[in-house]
Protein backbone atom coordinates (compact mmCIF):
# COMPACT_ATOMS: atom_id res chain seq x y z
CA UNK A 1 0.00 0.00 0.00
CA UNK A 2 1.40 3.38 -1.00
CA UNK A 3 1.86 6.36 1.26
CA UNK A 4 -1.40 7.93 0.17
CA UNK A 5 -3.39 4.84 -0.84
CA UNK A 6 -7.18 4.75 -0.63
CA UNK A 7 -8.28 3.26 2.69
CA UNK A 8 -5.01 3.98 4.48
CA UNK A 9 -5.32 5.43 7.97
CA UNK A 10 -4.32 9.07 8.27
CA UNK A 11 -2.78 10.38 11.48
CA UNK A 12 -4.89 13.16 12.98
CA UNK A 13 -2.93 16.31 13.79
CA UNK A 14 -5.73 18.69 14.75
CA UNK A 15 -6.88 17.14 18.02
CA UNK A 16 -4.46 18.44 20.71
CA UNK A 17 -5.49 22.06 20.22
CA UNK A 18 -9.18 21.21 20.43
CA UNK A 19 -8.88 18.76 23.33
CA UNK A 20 -6.93 21.25 25.44
CA UNK A 21 -9.54 23.99 25.13
CA UNK A 22 -7.70 26.08 22.56
CA UNK A 23 -10.35 25.86 19.87
CA UNK A 24 -11.81 29.07 18.50
CA UNK A 25 -15.57 28.82 18.06
CA UNK A 26 -18.08 31.51 17.27
CA UNK A 27 -19.15 32.07 20.87
CA UNK A 28 -15.49 32.69 21.79
CA UNK A 29 -15.43 35.69 19.46
CA UNK A 30 -16.74 39.16 20.25
CA UNK A 31 -16.37 42.39 18.30
CA UNK A 32 -15.86 45.89 19.68
CA UNK A 33 -19.20 47.65 20.34
CA UNK A 34 -21.03 44.40 19.64
CA UNK A 35 -24.79 44.17 20.19
CA UNK A 36 -26.89 41.05 20.74
CA UNK A 37 -29.93 39.73 18.92
CA UNK A 38 -32.88 37.62 20.00
CA UNK A 39 -35.51 36.29 17.62
CA UNK A 40 -39.19 35.95 18.48
CA UNK A 41 -40.45 32.83 16.70
CA UNK A 42 -43.79 31.47 15.63
CA UNK A 43 -45.63 29.21 18.10
CA UNK A 44 -47.93 28.01 15.30
CA UNK A 45 -47.41 25.55 12.45
CA UNK A 46 -49.69 27.57 10.17
CA UNK A 47 -51.30 30.92 10.90
CA UNK A 48 -52.00 34.36 9.52
CA UNK A 49 -50.29 37.21 11.35
CA UNK A 50 -53.13 39.57 12.24
CA UNK A 51 -51.04 42.22 14.00
CA UNK A 52 -47.67 42.83 15.66
CA UNK A 53 -47.34 45.40 18.46
CA UNK A 54 -43.72 46.24 19.22
CA UNK A 55 -44.23 49.60 20.97
CA UNK A 56 -43.26 48.41 24.46
CA UNK A 57 -40.26 46.48 23.19
CA UNK A 58 -38.85 49.48 21.33
CA UNK A 59 -38.59 51.55 24.52
CA UNK A 60 -37.30 48.74 26.73
CA UNK A 61 -33.87 49.23 28.37
CA UNK A 62 -30.89 48.73 26.08
CA UNK A 63 -32.91 48.13 22.91
CA UNK A 64 -31.49 49.43 19.60
CA UNK A 65 -33.87 47.87 17.06
CA UNK A 66 -37.09 45.88 16.83
CA UNK A 67 -37.75 44.74 13.28
CA UNK A 68 -40.52 42.79 11.56
CA UNK A 69 -40.99 41.14 8.21
CA UNK A 70 -42.54 44.32 6.88
CA UNK A 71 -39.36 46.24 7.78
CA UNK A 72 -37.34 43.56 6.01
CA UNK A 73 -39.47 43.83 2.87
CA UNK A 74 -39.57 47.65 2.92
CA UNK A 75 -35.77 47.73 3.04
CA UNK A 76 -35.64 45.90 -0.29
CA UNK A 77 -34.10 42.70 1.02
CA UNK A 78 -34.37 39.47 -0.93
CA UNK A 79 -35.01 35.88 0.08
CA UNK A 80 -33.09 33.23 1.99
CA UNK A 81 -31.16 31.52 -0.85
CA UNK A 82 -32.11 28.14 -2.25
CA UNK A 83 -30.81 25.77 -4.92
CA UNK A 84 -33.03 23.35 -6.81
CA UNK A 85 -33.12 22.28 -10.44
CA UNK A 86 -35.84 19.63 -10.55
CA UNK A 87 -39.14 20.01 -12.38
CA UNK A 88 -42.86 19.62 -11.86
CA UNK A 89 -45.05 17.08 -13.64
CA UNK A 90 -45.65 19.44 -16.57
CA UNK A 91 -41.92 20.03 -17.06
CA UNK A 92 -41.91 23.52 -15.54
CA UNK A 93 -39.29 24.41 -12.89
CA UNK A 94 -39.92 23.06 -9.41
CA UNK A 95 -41.99 25.21 -7.06
CA UNK A 96 -39.70 27.17 -4.74
CA UNK A 97 -41.63 29.51 -2.45
CA UNK A 98 -40.07 32.84 -1.54
CA UNK A 99 -38.56 32.61 1.93
CA UNK A 100 -38.15 35.97 3.68
CA UNK A 101 -35.78 36.04 6.64
CA UNK A 102 -38.67 37.36 8.77
CA UNK A 103 -42.24 36.20 8.25
CA UNK A 104 -44.49 38.50 6.24
CA UNK A 105 -48.23 38.07 6.70
CA UNK A 106 -48.21 34.34 7.48
CA UNK A 107 -46.16 31.73 9.32
CA UNK A 108 -45.94 28.21 7.92
CA UNK A 109 -43.99 26.32 10.57
CA UNK A 110 -43.31 26.43 14.28
CA UNK A 111 -40.11 28.33 15.03
CA UNK A 112 -40.12 30.60 12.00
CA UNK A 113 -38.57 34.06 12.72
CA UNK A 114 -41.23 36.75 13.23
CA UNK A 115 -39.55 39.65 15.06
CA UNK A 116 -35.86 40.53 15.49
CA UNK A 117 -34.78 42.37 18.65
CA UNK A 118 -31.31 43.91 19.08
CA UNK A 119 -30.04 45.25 22.42
CA UNK A 120 -26.90 45.95 24.43
CA UNK A 121 -27.05 42.52 26.06
CA UNK A 122 -28.72 39.24 25.24
CA UNK A 123 -30.75 39.43 28.44
CA UNK A 124 -32.10 42.86 27.52
CA UNK A 125 -32.98 41.66 24.04
CA UNK A 126 -34.78 38.63 25.48
CA UNK A 127 -36.67 40.72 28.01
CA UNK A 128 -37.78 43.10 25.26
CA UNK A 129 -38.92 40.22 23.05
CA UNK A 130 -41.32 39.16 25.80
CA UNK A 131 -43.04 42.56 25.54
CA UNK A 132 -44.02 41.99 21.90
CA UNK A 133 -47.66 41.15 21.24
CA UNK A 134 -48.31 39.11 18.10
CA UNK A 135 -51.90 38.19 17.24
CA UNK A 136 -52.29 35.09 15.09
CA UNK A 137 -55.24 33.50 13.31
CA UNK A 138 -54.44 29.76 13.19
CA UNK A 139 -54.94 27.83 9.95
CA UNK A 140 -55.21 24.07 9.26
CA UNK A 141 -51.78 22.46 9.11
CA UNK A 142 -50.29 19.30 7.63
CA UNK A 143 -47.00 17.80 8.82
CA UNK A 144 -46.87 14.45 6.99
CA UNK A 145 -45.53 14.49 3.43
CA UNK A 146 -47.77 11.51 2.69
CA UNK A 147 -50.91 13.25 3.96
CA UNK A 148 -49.94 16.55 2.30
CA UNK A 149 -50.20 14.91 -1.12
CA UNK A 150 -53.80 13.81 -0.63
CA UNK A 151 -56.74 15.70 -2.11
CA UNK A 152 -58.30 17.96 0.50
CA UNK A 153 -55.10 18.38 2.52
CA UNK A 154 -54.31 21.89 3.79
CA UNK A 155 -52.51 23.83 1.06
CA UNK A 156 -49.42 25.81 1.99
CA UNK A 157 -49.42 27.84 -1.23
CA UNK A 158 -52.30 28.57 -3.59
CA UNK A 159 -50.15 28.04 -6.69
CA UNK A 160 -48.68 24.70 -5.59
CA UNK A 161 -51.35 22.00 -6.07
CA UNK A 162 -51.20 19.06 -3.66
CA UNK A 163 -48.18 20.73 -2.00
CA UNK A 164 -45.89 19.02 -4.55
CA UNK A 165 -42.77 21.10 -5.15
CA UNK A 166 -41.33 18.72 -7.74
CA UNK A 167 -41.84 15.29 -9.29
CA UNK A 168 -38.90 13.08 -10.27
CA UNK A 169 -39.05 9.86 -12.26
CA UNK A 170 -36.28 7.42 -13.20
CA UNK A 171 -36.00 3.95 -14.70
CA UNK A 172 -38.15 2.00 -17.15
CA UNK A 173 -41.80 1.84 -16.09
CA UNK A 174 -42.97 -0.48 -18.86
CA UNK A 175 -40.18 -3.01 -18.34
CA UNK A 176 -40.63 -2.88 -14.58
CA UNK A 177 -44.40 -3.41 -14.79
CA UNK A 178 -43.83 -6.37 -17.11
CA UNK A 179 -41.28 -7.91 -14.74
CA UNK A 180 -43.68 -7.59 -11.81
CA UNK A 181 -46.49 -9.19 -13.83
CA UNK A 182 -44.31 -12.23 -14.61
CA UNK A 183 -42.61 -12.58 -11.22
CA UNK A 184 -43.20 -15.64 -9.04
CA UNK A 185 -43.01 -13.54 -5.90
CA UNK A 186 -43.46 -9.91 -4.92
CA UNK A 187 -42.77 -8.40 -1.50
CA UNK A 188 -43.86 -4.88 -0.61
CA UNK A 189 -43.51 -2.60 2.37
CA UNK A 190 -44.69 0.84 3.42
CA UNK A 191 -41.65 2.43 5.06
CA UNK A 192 -41.68 5.45 7.35
CA UNK A 193 -38.18 6.92 7.50
CA UNK A 194 -38.39 9.27 10.43
CA UNK A 195 -37.18 12.85 10.71
CA UNK A 196 -33.96 13.37 12.65
CA UNK A 197 -31.91 16.33 13.85
CA UNK A 198 -28.14 16.75 13.93
CA UNK A 199 -27.95 18.18 17.47
CA UNK A 200 -24.32 19.27 17.09
CA UNK A 201 -22.26 20.11 20.18
CA UNK A 202 -21.96 23.75 19.12
CA UNK A 203 -25.26 25.52 18.56
CA UNK A 204 -25.57 27.68 15.49
CA UNK A 205 -24.55 31.31 15.80
CA UNK A 206 -23.87 34.32 13.60
CA UNK A 207 -22.03 37.62 13.89
CA UNK A 208 -22.94 40.22 11.29
CA UNK A 209 -20.88 43.35 10.68
CA UNK A 210 -21.52 45.98 8.01
CA UNK A 211 -18.75 48.37 6.99
CA UNK A 212 -20.27 51.65 5.70
CA UNK A 213 -16.88 52.70 4.35
CA UNK A 214 -16.77 50.08 1.60
CA UNK A 215 -20.37 48.84 1.76
CA UNK A 216 -19.28 45.31 2.59
CA UNK A 217 -21.19 42.83 4.74
CA UNK A 218 -19.14 40.48 6.92
CA UNK A 219 -20.84 37.28 8.03
CA UNK A 220 -19.04 35.20 10.65
CA UNK A 221 -20.52 31.77 11.15
CA UNK A 222 -19.80 28.05 11.02
CA UNK A 223 -20.16 27.02 7.35
CA UNK A 224 -19.56 23.88 5.33
CA UNK A 225 -19.20 25.67 2.01
CA UNK A 226 -18.59 29.44 2.38
CA UNK A 227 -17.27 29.79 -1.18
CA UNK A 228 -20.65 28.63 -2.49
CA UNK A 229 -22.76 30.61 -0.03
CA UNK A 230 -21.07 33.89 -0.90
CA UNK A 231 -22.55 34.25 -4.37
CA UNK A 232 -25.96 32.96 -3.31
CA UNK A 233 -26.20 35.47 -0.46
CA UNK A 234 -25.06 38.31 -2.70
CA UNK A 235 -27.49 37.50 -5.50
CA UNK A 236 -30.60 36.32 -3.69
CA UNK A 237 -30.56 37.93 -0.23
CA UNK A 238 -28.57 41.18 -0.25
CA UNK A 239 -28.77 42.01 -3.97
CA UNK A 240 -25.20 43.31 -4.06
CA UNK A 241 -22.05 42.34 -5.99
CA UNK A 242 -20.33 39.22 -4.67
CA UNK A 243 -17.33 41.34 -3.69
CA UNK A 244 -19.52 43.06 -1.08
CA UNK A 245 -19.99 39.82 0.88
CA UNK A 246 -17.23 38.53 3.17
CA UNK A 247 -17.64 35.18 4.90
CA UNK A 248 -15.49 34.04 7.82
CA UNK A 249 -15.60 30.63 9.49
CA UNK A 250 -13.67 29.41 12.51
CA UNK A 251 -13.66 26.04 14.26
CA UNK A 252 -16.97 24.21 14.00
CA UNK A 253 -18.40 22.07 16.78
CA UNK A 254 -20.11 19.53 14.56
CA UNK A 255 -22.25 19.74 11.46
CA UNK A 256 -23.42 16.41 9.96
CA UNK A 257 -24.96 18.45 7.15
CA UNK A 258 -26.53 20.94 9.54
CA UNK A 259 -24.14 23.75 8.54
CA UNK A 260 -24.43 23.10 4.84
CA UNK A 261 -27.52 25.30 4.58
CA UNK A 262 -28.22 29.03 4.58
CA UNK A 263 -30.51 30.09 7.42
CA UNK A 264 -32.56 33.27 7.99
CA UNK A 265 -30.24 34.33 10.81
CA UNK A 266 -27.33 34.42 8.37
CA UNK A 267 -29.18 37.09 6.44
CA UNK A 268 -30.64 38.94 9.42
CA UNK A 269 -27.42 39.68 11.36
CA UNK A 270 -25.49 41.45 8.56
CA UNK A 271 -28.69 43.27 7.56
CA UNK A 272 -29.46 44.58 11.05
CA UNK A 273 -25.79 45.50 11.56
CA UNK A 274 -26.18 47.95 8.71
CA UNK A 275 -29.29 49.41 10.36
CA UNK A 276 -27.84 49.87 13.86
CA UNK A 277 -24.30 50.69 12.72
CA UNK A 278 -22.64 48.12 14.98
CA UNK A 279 -21.75 44.41 14.89
CA UNK A 280 -24.60 42.12 15.99
CA UNK A 281 -24.27 38.64 17.45
CA UNK A 282 -26.86 35.88 17.73
CA UNK A 283 -26.30 32.44 19.24
CA UNK A 284 -29.10 29.90 19.60
CA UNK A 285 -29.69 28.06 22.84
CA UNK A 286 -30.39 24.33 22.66
CA UNK A 287 -34.18 24.69 22.60
CA UNK A 288 -33.99 27.31 19.86
CA UNK A 289 -31.70 25.03 17.87
CA UNK A 290 -34.35 22.32 17.85
CA UNK A 291 -36.87 24.87 16.60
CA UNK A 292 -34.68 26.44 13.92
CA UNK A 293 -32.01 23.99 12.71
CA UNK A 294 -32.68 22.12 9.49
CA UNK A 295 -33.70 18.52 10.09
CA UNK A 296 -32.85 15.45 8.05
CA UNK A 297 -34.62 12.63 6.23
CA UNK A 298 -38.42 12.32 6.78
CA UNK A 299 -39.51 10.15 3.86
CA UNK A 300 -42.49 7.91 3.21
CA UNK A 301 -41.72 5.06 0.81
CA UNK A 302 -43.79 2.34 -0.82
CA UNK A 303 -41.21 -0.16 -2.09
CA UNK A 304 -41.63 -3.52 -3.85
CA UNK A 305 -39.25 -6.23 -5.06
CA UNK A 306 -40.12 -8.83 -7.72
CA UNK A 307 -38.18 -12.11 -7.84
CA UNK A 308 -38.28 -15.64 -9.20
CA UNK A 309 -39.00 -18.85 -7.32
CA UNK A 310 -35.26 -19.49 -6.96
CA UNK A 311 -34.68 -16.03 -5.49
CA UNK A 312 -33.33 -14.25 -8.56
CA UNK A 313 -34.21 -10.55 -8.40
CA UNK A 314 -36.08 -9.21 -11.43
CA UNK A 315 -37.26 -5.68 -10.64
CA UNK A 316 -37.70 -3.03 -7.98
CA UNK A 317 -40.43 -0.40 -7.81
CA UNK A 318 -40.34 2.65 -5.54
CA UNK A 319 -42.88 5.40 -4.85
CA UNK A 320 -41.47 7.95 -2.45
CA UNK A 321 -42.55 11.21 -0.82
CA UNK A 322 -39.83 13.44 0.65
CA UNK A 323 -40.66 16.08 3.25
CA UNK A 324 -38.97 19.37 2.29
CA UNK A 325 -40.63 21.43 5.04
CA UNK A 326 -42.53 24.69 4.62
CA UNK A 327 -39.79 26.09 2.37
CA UNK A 328 -37.00 24.58 0.30
CA UNK A 329 -33.69 24.87 2.13
CA UNK A 330 -30.43 25.62 0.33
CA UNK A 331 -29.82 22.00 -0.73
CA UNK A 332 -33.01 20.49 0.67
CA UNK A 333 -34.44 19.40 -2.67
CA UNK A 334 -31.63 16.92 -3.26
CA UNK A 335 -31.77 14.15 -0.59
CA UNK A 336 -35.08 12.56 -1.68
CA UNK A 337 -33.61 12.15 -5.19
CA UNK A 338 -29.88 11.64 -4.54
CA UNK A 339 -30.35 8.18 -3.08
CA UNK A 340 -32.14 6.78 -6.12
CA UNK A 341 -28.92 5.88 -7.91
CA UNK A 342 -28.16 3.33 -5.19
CA UNK A 343 -31.72 2.06 -4.73
CA UNK A 344 -30.81 -1.38 -6.12
CA UNK A 345 -28.02 -1.66 -3.60
CA UNK A 346 -25.29 -4.10 -4.63
CA UNK A 347 -27.63 -6.50 -6.39
CA UNK A 348 -28.10 -7.45 -10.04
CA UNK A 349 -31.57 -6.13 -10.75
CA UNK A 350 -32.48 -5.99 -14.45
CA UNK A 351 -35.02 -3.20 -14.26
CA UNK A 352 -36.36 -0.58 -11.86
CA UNK A 353 -38.78 2.31 -11.78
CA UNK A 354 -38.90 5.16 -9.28
CA UNK A 355 -41.29 8.06 -8.69
CA UNK A 356 -40.51 10.76 -6.11
CA UNK A 357 -42.49 13.75 -4.91
CA UNK A 358 -40.77 16.59 -3.06
CA UNK A 359 -43.46 17.75 -0.64
CA UNK A 360 -44.08 21.02 1.20
CA UNK A 361 -45.50 20.69 4.72
CA UNK A 362 -45.98 22.80 7.84
CA UNK A 363 -42.67 21.70 9.31
CA UNK A 364 -39.16 23.11 9.47
CA UNK A 365 -36.97 22.60 6.43
CA UNK A 366 -34.97 19.45 5.85
CA UNK A 367 -31.44 19.37 4.46
CA UNK A 368 -28.77 16.82 3.58
CA UNK A 369 -27.87 14.85 6.70
CA UNK A 370 -25.21 12.15 7.17
CA UNK A 371 -25.20 10.49 3.77
CA UNK A 372 -27.74 12.81 2.16
CA UNK A 373 -30.30 10.20 1.12
CA UNK A 374 -28.03 7.20 0.69
CA UNK A 375 -28.75 5.55 4.08
CA UNK A 376 -32.44 5.73 3.24
CA UNK A 377 -31.71 3.91 0.00
CA UNK A 378 -29.81 1.14 1.76
CA UNK A 379 -32.59 0.78 4.30
CA UNK A 380 -35.19 0.35 1.55
CA UNK A 381 -33.44 -2.35 -0.45
CA UNK A 382 -32.12 -4.29 2.54
CA UNK A 383 -35.57 -4.43 4.16
CA UNK A 384 -36.95 -5.84 0.91
CA UNK A 385 -34.18 -8.44 0.73
CA UNK A 386 -34.94 -9.57 4.27
CA UNK A 387 -38.63 -9.89 3.40
CA UNK A 388 -37.82 -11.87 0.26
CA UNK A 389 -35.62 -14.26 2.23
CA UNK A 390 -38.40 -14.75 4.75
CA UNK A 391 -40.92 -15.54 2.01
CA UNK A 392 -38.57 -18.09 0.44
CA UNK A 393 -37.49 -19.50 3.82
CA UNK A 394 -33.93 -18.83 2.66
CA UNK A 395 -30.84 -17.67 4.55
CA UNK A 396 -30.75 -13.87 3.97
CA UNK A 397 -26.98 -14.00 3.51
CA UNK A 398 -27.26 -16.62 0.79
CA UNK A 399 -30.03 -14.69 -0.97
CA UNK A 400 -27.73 -11.69 -1.00
CA UNK A 401 -24.86 -13.78 -2.32
CA UNK A 402 -27.06 -15.18 -5.09
CA UNK A 403 -27.94 -11.70 -6.38
CA UNK A 404 -24.79 -9.75 -5.56
CA UNK A 405 -23.03 -7.95 -8.42
CA UNK A 406 -19.77 -9.85 -9.10
CA UNK A 407 -16.53 -7.94 -9.45
CA UNK A 408 -16.18 -9.42 -12.94
CA UNK A 409 -19.27 -7.44 -14.02
CA UNK A 410 -17.60 -4.08 -13.39
CA UNK A 411 -18.25 -1.51 -14.65
CA UNK A 412 -21.90 -2.32 -13.93
CA UNK A 413 -24.65 -0.12 -15.36
CA UNK A 414 -27.56 -0.05 -12.95
CA UNK A 415 -31.13 0.32 -14.24
CA UNK A 416 -31.31 3.75 -12.62
CA UNK A 417 -28.78 6.59 -12.74
CA UNK A 418 -25.42 5.13 -11.71
CA UNK A 419 -22.70 3.00 -13.23
CA UNK A 420 -20.63 1.21 -10.57
CA UNK A 421 -17.00 1.37 -11.68
CA UNK A 422 -15.66 -1.11 -9.13
CA UNK A 423 -16.59 -3.15 -6.09
CA UNK A 424 -15.75 -6.38 -4.27
CA UNK A 425 -19.22 -6.83 -2.81
CA UNK A 426 -19.07 -10.59 -2.25
CA UNK A 427 -15.75 -10.20 -0.48
CA UNK A 428 -17.30 -7.46 1.67
CA UNK A 429 -20.15 -9.84 2.55
CA UNK A 430 -17.72 -12.59 3.55
CA UNK A 431 -15.71 -10.23 5.76
CA UNK A 432 -18.85 -8.87 7.42
CA UNK A 433 -20.20 -12.37 8.11
CA UNK A 434 -16.90 -13.46 9.61
CA UNK A 435 -16.57 -10.39 11.82
CA UNK A 436 -20.18 -10.76 12.99
CA UNK A 437 -19.79 -14.53 13.56
CA UNK A 438 -22.87 -15.12 11.43
CA UNK A 439 -22.47 -18.89 11.73
CA UNK A 440 -22.72 -18.61 15.51
CA UNK A 441 -25.81 -16.40 15.50
CA UNK A 442 -28.40 -19.23 15.97
CA UNK A 443 -26.60 -20.40 19.10
CA UNK A 444 -26.35 -16.86 20.48
CA UNK A 445 -30.06 -16.40 19.87
CA UNK A 446 -30.86 -19.57 21.81
CA UNK A 447 -28.71 -18.38 24.70
CA UNK A 448 -30.47 -15.01 24.77
CA UNK A 449 -33.87 -16.70 24.86
CA UNK A 450 -32.93 -18.92 27.77
Predicted feature residues:
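Flexible, low-hydrophobicity surface segments
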Residues: 1-161, 165, 275
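Alpha-helical support elements that line or immediately flank enzyme active sites
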Residues: 39-73, 115-135, 206-276, 333-342, ...
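Beta-strand segments within the central parallel beta-sheet cores of soluble alpha/beta enzyme folds
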Residues: 69, 243-250, 277-287, 314-319, ...
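Short acidic, glycine/serine/threonine-rich loops at helix termini
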Residues: 77-81, 128-131, 199, 230-232, ...
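Short coil/turn connectors at secondary-structure junctions
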Residues: 33-36, 60-64, 104, 111-114, ...
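Helix-loop-helix junctions that connect adjacent transmembrane helices in secondary transporters/permeases
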Residues: 153-237, 406-450
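Glycine-rich loop/linker segments at domain edges
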Residues: 8, 14-17, 83-97, 163-206, ...
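Glycine-rich and small/hydrophobic secondary-structure elements
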Residues: 83-124, 257-309, 366-391, 413-438
Amino acid sequence: MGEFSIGQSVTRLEDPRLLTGKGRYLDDINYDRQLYAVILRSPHAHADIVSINTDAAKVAPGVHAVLTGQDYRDDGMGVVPCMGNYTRRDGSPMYIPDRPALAVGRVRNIGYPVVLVVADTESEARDASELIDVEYSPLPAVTSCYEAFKDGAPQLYDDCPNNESYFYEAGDKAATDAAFDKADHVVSQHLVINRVTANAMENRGVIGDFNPGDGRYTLRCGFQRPWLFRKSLADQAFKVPESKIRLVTDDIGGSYGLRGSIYPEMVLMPWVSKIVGRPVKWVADRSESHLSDDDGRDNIVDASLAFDADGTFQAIRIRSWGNLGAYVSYRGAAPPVVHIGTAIGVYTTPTAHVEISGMLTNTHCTSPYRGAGRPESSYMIERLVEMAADELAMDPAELRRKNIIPSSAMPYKTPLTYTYDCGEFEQNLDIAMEMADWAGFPERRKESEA
